[in-house]
Amino acid sequence: MKEYKTIDLFAGIGGIRLGFEAFGCKNVFSSEWDKYAQSMYEVNFGEKPFGDINDISPSDIPDHDILLAGFPCQPFSIAGKGLGFADTRGTLFFNIEAILKAKKPKAFLLENVKRLTTHDNGNTFKVINDKLNKLGYTVYHKVLNTLDFGLPQKRERIYIVGFLDKLHFEFPKPIGKYEELSNILESDDVVPNNYFLSDELKRKRLSSITKDVPYPSIWHENISGNVSALPYSCALSVGGSYNYLVVNGVRRLTGPEMLRLQGFPDTFEINIPYSQVRKVAGNSVSVPVIRAIAGSMINSLNMATRKIYQAIQLSLLD
């Protein structure tokens, strides 16, 4: 199998990289500005990502086959208003665009929040898609749910895949089941006391439950204060309160549990404070979803390579 070189932009703690390394890809560059994510990335991959992508020239980035980026969704205030290239300047997508233009990798994978497709009445996504097309890429996109790829977390994200050649590509199909929470959650008796809610909070949560409660379950409190108990987790969130997700109505998720809900292996080391683990886990990607997409992308690239090789062989026989 051909070894493809990747770069990991807005890398977080390396979830996208993990998904592609499962297929033998070699990462040659990474960028992440958050110091805690950098620290966790370094302890697990043996290299510290470069800092702010705005301080890095595309010419300084190594040649690569696949660009990977879980880029932040910033408001495209003038997106879709016919202002040409300036309509993406000042947003972090501009950096991706500049690197694709300069380095022309064979393929890319971008990940973002589901609402990217509807932001500014769809203009934001239209600008992104048009820019990628103008760079010569055939672009595919789809919203996928982590719950459909083996993890007990309802997390819908848009995945944008592009190829420099007009390659056939299909997004992976859902596997139709997810792991039981009992395989993700730790036993309460090994969880430190400071993770448990006060009696008052527990009573308040319990009084808000109106339906039968499955066990084990993760209790989710929405913005209106309504509480639901589910056999899976709602999406891990950077902005959620410490009690946004509660295990069986009695305690907060631990750091390892949050990483498991994103599909990271137990060997993935945590070396940052709990408050920062919540942030990097909420900002991260679901590794099994990335792994499934990576497999489909690698398959498309390999098929194209085989066709080129076969064409060369046939031409030599003529």
Curated annotation (Swiss-Prot):
Its EC number is 2.1.1.37. It is an enzyme of class 2 (transferase). One of its GO terms (biological process) is methylation. GO terms for molecular function: DNA (cytosine-5-)-methyltransferase activity; DNA binding. The keyword Transport does not apply. The active site is at C73. InterPro entries: C5-MTase, C5_DNA_meth_AS, C5_MeTfrase, C5_meth_CS, SAM-dependent_MTases_sf. PROSITE patterns: C5_MTASE_1 (PS00094), C5_MTASE_2 (PS00095), SAM_MT_C5 (PS51679). Residues 4-304 form the SAM-dependent MTase C5-type domain. It catalyses: a 2'-deoxycytidine in DNA + S-adenosyl-L-methionine = a 5-methyl-2'-deoxycytidine in DNA + S-adenosyl-L-homocysteine + H(+). Gene3D superfamilies: DNA Methylase, subunit A, domain 2 (3.90.120.10), Vaccinia Virus protein VP39 (3.40.50.150). Keywords: DNA-binding, Methyltransferase, Restriction system, S-adenosyl-L-methionine, Transferase. A methylase, recognizes the double-stranded sequence 5'-RGCGCY-3', methylates C-? on both strands, and protects the DNA from cleavage by the HaeII endonuclease. Belongs to the class I-like SAM-binding methyltransferase superfamily. C5-methyltransferase family. This is Type II methyltransferase M.HaeII. The lineage of its organism: Bacteria, Pseudomonadati, Pseudomonadota, Gammaproteobacteria, Pasteurellales. The gene is haeIIM.
